Swiss-Prot record:
The active site is at C2 (for gatase activity). It comes from the Eukaryota. This is Glutamine--fructose-6-phosphate aminotransferase [isomerizing]. The gene is GFA1. Pathway: Nucleotide-sugar biosynthesis; UDP-N-acetyl-alpha-D-glucosamine biosynthesis; alpha-D-glucosamine 6-phosphate from D-fructose 6-phosphate: step 1/1. Residues 390-529, 562-707 form the SIS domain. It comes from Saccharomyces cerevisiae (strain ATCC 204508 / S288c).
């Protein structure tokens, strides 16, 4: 939820028009995350002024607002920092006054964009109101901007002219909750602060010259930092302030009635960032792109650095410095600059009408990529590099706990049975929010598996921290390299599905499913009794991409069904049993979130325990009738439906004589899909429902990629 984007150019001349276009384009590439308003902040015409443009609605509405305000687009800047934001309302309605950026005062001295929720904002707001500050919005973010101004003025009055990152540390000390934020200020021209806690942030670096090293050092205070003192001087520069213009500091008395005054950290481990050193020591032209998502950066650069929780990034004078308040045992001393594997074409629609449609049709390729290089079909071996060293520990586990939300939860449900069958380890599947609410007991001999497409899901991250505190081994199954879950877990698997832009997860679901099956296969490769079963599954996986391609040919038939039998329906029932129960739940979720039609996935065995009361000739029903050990029971459940005048649509295997015979005497329709191994059949069966949800939505004129009230990456509780 929400999206942050920032752009800083240093010794790279850009017009105001180019800067605005870069910021707006960055926001457009964050649209899929979900939002209800947008805004940007850039330097104004005067030396200490800031232009803020914000608007409710789409990014296109913001572009119209900027055009209406008619700023001089031809003014050029050799160095400049601009920030931008797409907002998902958490505090305050979607109104222009609540849009980000939020300002500290009418003079725009400090301007902030923020993702997350500040849980103590009411206390902060009360404190600031008592000190005379007037609030314009209902947001928690405005508290941050005003807190910046208050602490800046307080320290200035007491003789402390703070560096931007020192001031930010004081602000962060007062904040509780989660945040990813950017701040710019007229007091610190051409500088920007980026910091995160529980909300993702990355920084892209673009330079014509090759970087000297592929990392940035983390800078810590010295042991005696925290004691106010007169700064040391070296070469006319304040020690610890790098190439910035020297500032004079004086130790002043603290006023007990004000928030804490800075104990200046003059003795910082601070030097020119090694990554940005030039051969002759002259400044290097460079551009920085700060974002909550790699999709908005890849157009400009593939060199990115992922911030970790409590990192404080300070960009100024063409350099990037990363500060932390304290050194933790075992913490990394650097942040590596990585190369994104994402291609620009992957986040473009191409010939498709919607990203969701594109991603449905990418599944033959995405499922193949999930398995690429990991399965040896000739020798029936599965090798997951990220798990290999940890498998002996996992095999000794007392139980496996799979924790996820939404679609990722369904992929866990879909594979629970095969985990139990192959490993003989009890497996529980938990919704992250419920897991936390119950304070579920977790022990050191448990293995906790966290599944998330984005790797940033807030509830899943909180559950992960909960399990780490209790000493459990943690495994991450994610699609986003460098995400929080991938960094914090002990080991894991990257599903390699490629960027997924549509809010409704399609290809990530099938890739998660396959990654979990491969995990189960790896876990059981030491069991002689499971060899035949493992070979059957591995050979079944080999055929999956081709079988998905075959199922996609059903689209014309499904499109027609959506335009006739399912048109204008208010509710839909999906029946599944065994491995297909997860498919029923996932199919129902897709139809709900994309077409806004009420749909319910039901365990077929529970039909007669209440759900059967809903069945009549008007209720559309979709049932999974593919072949497995539970097929006779599924047939029995469907016969109960038809006996109550129900007219089910059966997803069955090709050339199945049972359904062919029944269709002669019972009013039912079939959608035939290829047959595969029972534990993999859900991969094939979900494709028709993805297509069905898509066409139901398109026929209603719904924006498939941006369903109302939903966000792609849920980074708040």
């Amino acid at each position: 939820m929400c999206g942050i984007f920032g752009y800083c150019n240093y010794l790279v001349e850009r017009s105001r028009g180019e800067i605005i276009d870069t910021l707006v384009d960055g926001l457009q590439r964050l649209e899929y995350r979900g939002y209800d308003s947008t805004g940007i902040a850039i330097d104004g015409d005067e030396a200490d002024s800031t232009f803020i443009y914000k608007q409710i609605g789409k990014v296109s509405a913001l572009k119209e607002e900027i055009t209406k305000q008619n700023p001089n687009r031809d003014v050029t800047f050799v160095s400049h920092c601009g920030i931008a934001h797409t907002r998902w309302a958490t505090h305050g309605r979607p109104e222009q006054v609540n849009c980000h950026p939020q300002r500290s005062d009418p003079e725009d001295q400090f301007v902030v964009v923020h993702n997350g929720i500040i849980t103590n904002f009411r206390e902060l707001k009360t404190l600031l109101i008592n000190k005379g500050y007037k609030f314009e919005s209902d947001t928690d973010t405005e508290c941050i901007a005003k807190l910046y101004l208050h602490l800046y003025n307080t320290n200035l009055q007491n003789g402390h002219d703070l560096d931007f990152h020192e001031l930010t540390k004081l602000v962060l000390l007062e904040l509780e909750g989660s945040y990813g934020l950017l701040c710019k200020s007229c007091h610190y021209p051409n500088e920007v602060i980026a910091t995160r806690k529980g909300s993702p942030l990355l920084i892209g670096v673009k330079s014509e010259k090759k970087l000297k090293v592929d990392f940035v050092d983390v800078e810590f205070p010295e042991e005696n930092a925290g004691q106010p003192e007169i700064p040391l001087k070296s070469n006319n520069k304040s020690f610890g302030l790098g190439p910035k213009k020297a500032r004079e500091f004086e130790a002043g008395s603290q006023n007990a009635n004000l928030l804490p005054i800075a104990a200046n950290e003059f003795n910082l481990r601070h030097s020119q960032s090694r990554a940005f050193l030039s051969e002759d020591g002259s400044p290097t032209p460079v551009e920085f792109f700060v974002s909550s998502d790699a999709a908005s950066v890849v157009k400009h650069t593939k060199k990115v650095l992922f911030l970790e929780d409590d990192d404080l990034a300070h960009i100024y004078d063409g350099e990037l410095h990363i500060h932390r308040s304290r050194r933790e045992v075992g913490a990394s001393m650097t942040r590596s600059i990585q190369t994104l594997e994402m291609e620009l074409a992957q986040i473009m629609k191409g010939p498709y009408d919607h990203f969701m449609q594109k991603e449905i049709y990418e599944q033959p390729e995405s499922t193949f990529n999930t398995m690429r290089g990991r399965i040896d079909y000739e020798n029936n071996k599965v090798i997951l590099g990220g798990l290999k060293a940890w498998l002996p520990v996992v095999r000794r586990a007392r139980r496996l706990i799979m924790i996820a939300c939404g679609t990722s939860y369904h992929s866990c449900l879909a594979t629970r049975a095969i985990f139990e069958e192959l490993s003989d380890i009890p497996v529980s599947v938990e919704l992250a929010s419920d897991f936390l609410d119950r304070k579920c007991p977790v022990f050191r001999d448990d293995v906790c598996v966290f599944v998330s497409q984005s790797g940033e899901t807030a509830d899943t991250m909180l559950a992960l921290n909960y399990c780490l505190e209790r000493g459990a081994l943690t495994v991450g199954i994610v699609n986003s390299v460098g995400s929080s879950i991938s960094r914090v877990t002990h080991c894991g698997v990257h599903i390699n599905a490629g960027p997924e832009i549509g809010v409704a997860s399609t290809k990530a679901y099938t890739s998660q499913y396959i990654a979990l099956v491969m995990f189960a296969l790896s876990l059981s490769d030491d069991r002689v009794s499971k060899i035949d079963r493992r070979i059957e599954i591995i050979q079944g996986l080999k055929l999956i991409p081709g079988q998905i391609k075959q199922v996609l040919k059903l689209e014309p038939r499904i499109k027609k069904l959506c335009a006739t039998e399912l048109k204008d329906q208010k509710s839909l029932l999906l029946l599944g049993r065994g491995y297909q129960f997860a498919a029923a739940l996932e199919g129902a979720l897709k139809i709900k979130e994309i077409s806004y039609m009420h749909s319910e996935g039901v365990l077929a065995g529970e039909l007669k325990h209440g759900v059967l009361a809903l069945v009549d000739e008007n209720l559309p029903i979709i049932a999974f009738g593919t072949r497995d050990s539970l097929f006779p029971k599924v047939v029995s459940s469907i016969e109960q439906v038809t006996a109550r005048k129900g007219h089910p649509i059966i997803i069955c295997n090709e050339n199945d004589e049972v359904w062919a015979q029944k269709s002669k005497s019972i009013d039912l329709q079939t959608l035939e899909v290829p047959q595969t191994v029972d534990c993999l059949q859900g991969l094939i069966n979900i494709i028709p429902l993805q297509l069905m949800s898509y066409w139901l939505a398109v026929n209603k004129g719904i924006d498939v990629d941006f369903p109302r009230n939903l966000a792609k990456s849920v980074t708040v509780e």
